[in-house]
């Protein structure tokens, strides 16, 4: 599970609370914004151990702080387990800002050394107003969108595809869609996206 702007404030550690409630014991959290009594930031929850964790600062100049949280895990697909790279991105509000942030991420050490067939899941609040970031920046380097372009904001009447899930390497997408339950519309001003993935077992 990947969360953006997850709070840790007023003595409530939501990352740990969600970890316990969902039975996902492995947690990585980086507070993009720190306050006197807490803050909020990117979070990855997993049933499997997380390693090789990197945080990349994507802040442009004096704009609001943004970042990427990346971790490596071993996921079971049937009788086999494979390494999967998980990347949680939160991009800025301005179009030029988002482009610069993606270029910085794609040129960064945690990412640029990965083989194209290495399974990668990249997801988050991309603030992608028009759904163009994938075709412009991610698909040229081998990513594909998990499922159709989906409107996720605002949650109660979605009109913008701000959020997205992209995959690269030996991964196949079975489905990717937002849950339609009322609680999903109440939990956040963005609808969540849920993807079901398989591994192409003929990979290295």
Predicted ranges, named:
Residues 1-9:
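Active-site neighborhood of divalent metal-dependent phosphoester/pyrophosphate hydrolases
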Residues 8-10, 16-21, 25-204:
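Active-site regions of metal-assisted phosphoester/phosphodiester hydrolases
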């Amino acid at each position: 599970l990947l969360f953006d702007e997850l709070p840790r404030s007023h003595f409530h550690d939501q990352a740990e609370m969600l970890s316990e409630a969902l039975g996902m014991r492995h947690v990585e959290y980086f507070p993009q914004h720190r306050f006197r009594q807490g803050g909020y930031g990117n979070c990855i929850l997993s049933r499997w151990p997380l390693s090789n964790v990197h945080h990349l600062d994507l802040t442009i100049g004096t704009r609001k702080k943004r970042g990427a949280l990346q971790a490596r895990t071993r996921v079971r697909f049937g009788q086999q387990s494979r390494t999967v790279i998980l990347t949680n991105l939160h991009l800025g509000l301005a179009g030029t800002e988002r482009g610069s942030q993606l270029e910085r991420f794609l040129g960064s050490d945690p990412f640029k050394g990965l083989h194209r067939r290495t399974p990668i899941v990249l997801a988050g609040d991309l603030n992608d107003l028009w759904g163009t970031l994938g075709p412009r920046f991610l698909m040229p380097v081998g990513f594909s969108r998990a499922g159709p372009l989906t409107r996720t904001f605002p949650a109660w009447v979605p009109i913008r595809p701000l959020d997205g899930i992209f995959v690269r390497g030996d991964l196949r997408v079975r489905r990717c869609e937002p849950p339609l339950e009322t609680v999903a519309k109440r939990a956040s001003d963005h609808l969540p996206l849920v993807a079901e993935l398989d591994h192409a077992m003929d990979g290295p």
